[in-house]
Amino acid sequence: MEANMSFENDYYSPIQLFAEIEAYANTMDKSPDLDILRTIEEFDETLLSEIEVRTQSIPSPLVAPSVTKMSLPSPSPAPPNSLYTRLLHELDFVEGPSILARLEKINVDLFSCFPHNKHLYEHAKILSVSPSEVLEELSKNTWTYTALNLNEHGEMALPMPPTTKADLPSYVDDIQNFYLGELEAREKSYATMFYGYCRALAEYIRQSAIKDLRDARVEDKNIGACSKARQYIAERYYREAARFAKLLYVHLYLSTTRDVSQRLEASQMGRQNIFVYLKCEWLQERHFHCLFQPVIFNHGVVIVEGRVLTAPELRAQNYIRSEFGLPLIRCKLVEEPDMPLISPPPFSGDAPRASVYLLQCIRSKLEVYSLSHPPNPQLHVHKEHVHVQKLESPPNYGTTVEALLMDSSDRNSISPGDPVATTISTL
C-alpha cells in the first residue's frame, strides 16, 4: 500500500501529485493485489512509536467510562459576572475563556456536524425571545434543581474493535451511535443547568429593575416595574445568556469528545492491524474536521471530498486536536517519515472562524422554543428583542453574532448541524 502513496518531501509538481492520486484511486477500485495484502498482514504498529508533541491529552487513557461529576444546586440571583465565574468553577473549566479565544484564530468548522438535539429545548420558555414570557417563568420552580450528573452516560456500552475486517463498517457505525448517545445523555444535564443559570440571571435583572424604580416618580409602581423589567430583560438578558451558553456548550462538546476519544484510543491501540483494511471517506471537509472522529488509528485509505488526504492537511488537523486536548489521528499511509505529527493551519481574518460555527450550533438550540411558539406569527423573532440584527445585514465573522435567531433560508448562513457522515468500506 505504501508503494502507491509515496511522500518523500513537502513538494510535488502538479503532474506528480495527479499521477500519485490517480494511481492510489485506481488501487482502491480494484481488489488488493498480493503485495498490498502482504503489506497489510505484515503491518507493525511499533512503527507508530510515540513522537513527543505538544498536547493536553490525558496520558494512559482508560477504556472505563468517566466517573460521576455532580453539579452544585441551581444558582441564586446574582450579577452576570458573578454567575459566569460560578459557572467556570462549577464546570472546572478555568481554561474556558482561553479556549473560546483560540476558536477566534481557527478557520475550521469544528462544530456544525454535532446534532442539535432540539427536542431537549422544545419547552424551554425561559429561553423565549419575548421578555414578558421570560418574566412569567421566574415564579415557577421548573428551572431549579438540587444536583445534576454532568458525566451522564447513554445506554450503549463502548463497542470494542472487531477481529475481522468485514465487521469494520458496522463497528464505525456503532461508535458513532455510541458517541451520539453519550452526547445526548450529557446534554440533558447541561441544558437543565443552563436553564438554572438563565433563571438566576433573569431574576437578578428583574430585581434590578424594581430597585431602580423605588425612588422614581411613577404614578403606578406596578405598571412601571413591569415595563422596566421587560426593558432590562431585552437589553441585558439575551446577551448574557448567550455568553453563558458559549462557555457551557463548548465544555459539553470538548469534555464528551475527550472522554470518548480517550476511551477509543485505549481500545483501538492494541488492534491497529485491523484498521489497515479500512477505507474511510468523508463526503464533506467539515466531516473530517469535526472534533469527534470514530477511528483514532486510521491506517487504511483516507478520502476527503473525493481526494486523497494529504500529510499537511493531517498535520494541521492534528495541531487543532492537540490544542483542544484530543488524541491525534494516526494515518500510516498519509504520515511522512521524519516529519512532525502537527503543524499550525493557515489562518485568514476574512474567512469564517470556528467560533461562528459554535455560535450557529448554540443558536439552533436557543431558538427552538420561540420558533415553535412565536410571539408574532409574522416574525421569526419578537420586536422586544433588541439584540436581533437586521437579517439583510451580513454576519460579522470577526465578532460575536448577537442575534439569537437568524433566517435559516439566508444563503450566507452556516450549514445546519448533522451527525458525522462517513462512508466506510473495507479493502
From Swiss-Prot:
Domain of life: Viruses
Source organism per UniProt: Gallid herpesvirus 2 (strain Chicken/Md5/ATCC VR-987)
GO cellular component, one term: host cell nucleus
GO biological process: DNA-templated viral transcription; regulation of DNA-templated transcription
Descriptive protein name: Tegument protein VP16 homolog
Physiological role: Transcriptional activator of immediate-early (IE) gene products (alpha genes). Acts as a key activator of lytic infection by initiating the lytic program through the assembly of the transcriptional regulatory VP16-induced complex composed of VP16 and two cellular factors, HCFC1 and POU2F1. VP16-induced complex represents a regulatory switch: when it is on, it promotes IE-gene expression and thus lytic infection, and when it is off, it limits IE-gene transcription favoring latent infection.
Protein family membership: Belongs to the herpesviridae tegument protein VP16 protein family.
Record's keyword annotation contains rRNA-binding: no
Example GO molecular function: DNA binding
Pfam families with a match to the protein in the record: Alpha_TIF (PF02232)
UniProt keywords, alphabetically: DNA-binding, Host nucleus, Phosphoprotein, Transcription, Transcription regulation, Virion, Virion tegument
Gene that encodes the chain: MDV061
Location of the protein in the cell: Virion tegument; Host nucleus
